[in-house]
């Protein structure tokens, strides 16, 4: 579960390394974000000499959380870290590579481009 002020790792090659969530996109009362939700975040750490700069406001989709996620068949999946991928306004990833596994639940949120870039789909 991701809420405001939560730090996340970026697992693509867009140029950012860490972001901090500042808003969960959706209903005005929505406090927590889960896998597949879009957040608005600020870049806290970036790779030097890239197009992403620190303190830049970006949109990101959550692909892994430390809080376990339960599927409809009862299987629970948990990750070691909170991870996200930076996207543009249309929902396309800004990076061209994705590091680490992603969950197949992203398919129902129409993030098929992220799934095709991922090396492993759980």
UniProtKB/Swiss-Prot annotation:
InterPro entries membership: Ribosomal_uL14, Ribosomal_uL14_bac-type, Ribosomal_uL14_sf
Coiled coil regions, renumbered to chain: none
Principal location listed in the UniProt entry: plastid
GO cellular component: chloroplast; cytosolic large ribosomal subunit
UniProt-recorded Gene Ontology molecular function terms: large ribosomal subunit rRNA binding; structural constituent of ribosome
Compartments (UniProt record): Plastid, Chloroplast
Keywords annotated in UniProt: Chloroplast, Plastid, Ribonucleoprotein, Ribosomal protein, RNA-binding, rRNA-binding
GO aspect biological process, one term: translation
Cysteines paired by S-S bonds: none
Keyword Ribosomal protein: yes
Presence of the UniProt keyword Chloroplast in the record: yes
Domain of life of the organism encoding this protein: Eukaryota
Family per record: Belongs to the universal ribosomal protein uL14 family.
Known partners and oligomeric status: Part of the 50S ribosomal subunit.
Protein task: Binds to 23S rRNA.
The protein, known as: Large ribosomal subunit protein uL14c
Record organism: Welwitschia mirabilis (Tree tumbo)
Recorded name of the encoding gene: rpl14
